[in-house]
Amino acid sequence: MSLTITSSVTHPELKDLSTVRNEQKELNISPVHDVNVTKATATFGMGCFWGAESLYGATRGVLRTTVGYAGGSSDLPTYRKMGDHTEVLEIDYDPTVISFKELLDLFWNNHEYGLTTPIKRQYASLILYHDEEQKQVAHASKLEEQERRAPEIITTEIASKENFYPAEAYHQKYRLQGHKDLASSLNLSPKLLQTSYVATKLNGYLAGVGGIEQFKAEAETMGLTPTQRQYCYYHVEQNEGQGLYC
C-alpha cells in the first residue's frame, strides 16, 4: 500500500492500539524485524551508546544495531559492573549499500567526548575489527584522521573483536522505547529490541537523525501501518536537526 503522509496539526496519538491492530489485519501489514540480505558487522565504542545507536540506526544501509559491552576481559559485564569493558555499538550493515570506511567516517566525526581527550574506559574511543580487511581499513583510516587533526593525538584504540555482551533491555533502542505506545504496537520482545530492523531505523529517525525526506523514502521498508507512519512522521519532523544526546 502506498501512503501519502501529510503533517498533522495536532499531536497524533497511539493510545488506542486496536486501530493499529485492525490496520495490520485489514492491510496484511506487520513490522519488518528482519531483512534477508547478506550482512557484515562492525563494532565501535564512541562514548554513550544511546546516541551512537540512533546515529547509525537512521543511516542508509544499516540493518541492525545492538548496544553492549566489549573490549575488556571481565566476564559477564553489566551496566553496574562493567569491569574493564567499554560501551559499544554492534552494527549489522549491507556492504553493497554502505562500506566499512563510510561507517568509520561517521565514527570519527560523532564522538560524544571527542577523539583526543583521555576518558574513562566506559566511554573510550574503540574500534573492534571483525576480520583482517577491517583491521587494515581501520588503521589506515585512523592514520588519515591523525594527519588531519595534528598536532592533537587521537586516543582511539583498535583491537580484535572478541566477546560482545548485549546490554540490558532498557538500554536497547532507548529513544524508541521513550515512545511507549509505538514500541508496544511493534510487538517488540526483549530479543527483538536487540535485533529488529524496524526498531533500529525508528530509534534513529525518532531522535531526529536522517530527516523527514529520508524517513519518507525508507518508511515503505519497515512494515508500518498508516497510523504508525503518521505518528512517526510527526515526531521525525519535530525532532529533525536537534542533534544527538545522552
Curated annotation (Swiss-Prot):
Post-translational events: Conjugated to URM1, a ubiquitin-like protein.
GO cellular component: cytoplasm; mitochondrion
S-S bridge residues: C48-C246
Active site: C48
Record EC number: 1.8.4.11
Gene Ontology MF term list: L-methionine-(S)-S-oxide reductase activity; peptide-methionine (S)-S-oxide reductase activity
Induction cue: By ecdysone.
Physiological role: Has an important function as a repair enzyme for proteins that have been inactivated by oxidation. Catalyzes the reduction of methionine sulfoxide in proteins to methionine. Does not catalyze the reverse reaction involving the oxidation of methionine residues.
Protein family according to the UniProt entry: Belongs to the MsrA Met sulfoxide reductase family.
Protein name: Peptide methionine sulfoxide reductase
Gene source species: Drosophila melanogaster (Fruit fly)
